A protein has these predicted regions:
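Segments that shape or occlude catalytic/ligand-binding pockets
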Residues: 32-90
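A gly/proline- and charged-residue-enriched helix-loop-helix capping module
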Residues: 86-102, 121-123, 127-167
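Short, solvent-exposed loop/edge-beta patches enriched in aromatic
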Residues: 15, 47-54, 109-111, 175
Length: 392
């Protein structure tokens, strides 16, 4: 089987010729590798280590390799200003409001920056550190109303050339794997992660529950259109929603009340267009598995075992059944990233990990190394072990 055939077989719950594994790298991951390896394109690097290519959206790709989105969020009532500081010099420039979603700039920002969304209803300001919010734009009822007005005045507008860029990226991947489009977090998660943060979210929800529900409804109405456009136009068989959900941020009861109905709607849209729905869940999700199951999803990406997470692949199968898709179950980070871990230790862990049940499962093992400098030897050790299990 080729990598593409193997991943397609897993998606369709068909037998495979060998165990499947993948990874996701960026320039930080490869920073300590030999120069000739750092120069490889992401796809050629994946071929070099021998994994199946499961390209997670556009992560790690250059503009020439990336797939264009079939839609973009536009708001004609909003202008965006980005302030960056380098070597003591402040730079301020306008960026199109159409390119700003959830308060994160269209361009990657290294270092500290301030993003201001200016509207007739007021201004929301976000302080970013390496593209992550360190102060949140929404911390009051007034801010919440501004954000709701932005969403009510926004629309997802279809863009040309997605299909052509998808075909180009698929040609670059070839038979070695597949490109899987990703979608931004659902409304609750985007508020928790980017717009409010956990503390502001719960204070505002406690003080102004109806205003919070109104904001979430406005966001959801627009996000449904985004999902419909993507599901209708993408040639991909599966879509991954990047949820990052964790019981450290939301309780099972609140997940069921707020997140579940919205995610179930998104899953229904994908299914209506013949797509499989997979949720990226890299947090602590054991306590959330019951309401997550009620979304009707087909699989989970990035289920993470202890001690970093609290949910192993077998935990997921215990709850969802052995036909469920583990489309990227995380290799134990405490082993993979252990200082001076040997190839023998990694391979011994793999031997213990792959119980007869997991060998039969619809499983892609995922080495989670994005943003983490990782020795080349660790990938090669996993690849060598996997190759030795062909036909098993």
């Amino acid at each position: 089987m080729t990598g593409r055939e193997r991943l397609q077989a897993i998606l369709n719950r068909q037998p495979i010729d060998r165990l499947s594994w993948t990874t996701l790298v960026d320039h930080v991951t490869r920073a300590g590798m030999p120069a000739e390896v750092r120069k490889l394109s992401p796809f050629d690097f994946y071929r070099h280590i021998g994994c199946d290519i499961l390209q997670f959206g556009n992560y790690g790709l250059s503009a020439e390799e990336a797939v264009l989105s079939p839609s973009r969020l536009t708001c004609t009532e909003m202008t965006c200003e980005l302030e960056t500081e380098k070597d003591g010099k402040l730079t301020r420039h306008q960026i199109p409001g159409a390119n700003v979603t959830f308060g994160i700039g269209a361009e990657t920002v290294t270092g500290r920056a301030v993003l201001k969304r200016k509207t007739p209803w007021g201004t929301l300001s976000t302080t970013l550190e390496n593209d992550h919010p360190v102060t949140y734009p929404v911390s009051s009822l007034e801010d919440m109303r501004i954000l709701r007005s932005i969403w009510e005045a926004s629309d997802y507008v279809e863009q040309d050339d997605m299909e052509a860029s998808f075909a180009r990226t698929e040609r670059l991947i070839g038979d070695d794997g597949m490109y899987v489009p990703t979608v931004d977090p659902s409304p609750v998660q985007s508020l928790l992660e980017y717009e409010m943060g956990v503390e502001n979210f719960y204070y505002l929800f406690a003080d102004y529950p109806e205003e919070m529900k109104s904001l979430l409804a406005a966001m959801h109405a627009k996000r449904l259109k985004e999902y419909e456009i993507l599901a209708r136009r993408t040639p991909a068989e599966v879509v991954i929603a990047v949820e990052n959900t964790s019981s450290a941020m939301i309780s099972p009861d609140l997940y069921r009340a707020l997140s579940l109905p919205q995610i179930r709607d998104y899953v229904d849209v994908l299914h209506a267009h013949g797509k499989k729905a997979v949720l990226h869940m890299c947090g602590h999700i054991r306590e959330l598995l019951e309401p997550i199951r009620e979304t009707g999803l087909d699989g989970i990406n990035a289920a993470t075992p202890p001690p970093i997470g609290n949910t192993s692949g077998e935990d997921v199968l215990d709850f969802f059944g052995d036909d469920f898709l583990l489309f990227g179950a995380v290799f134990d980070p405490s082993v993979l990233h252990k200082a001076d871990v040997s190839s023998a230790e990694l391979q011994d862990h793999l031997t213990r990990l792959y119980t007869p049940r997991l060998r039969r499962a619809n499983l892609v093992l995922w080495l989670a190394v994005d943003g983490l400098t990782t020795p080349l030897q660790r990938f090669l050790a996993v690849g060598q072990w996997m190759k030795g299990r062909e036909g098993q």
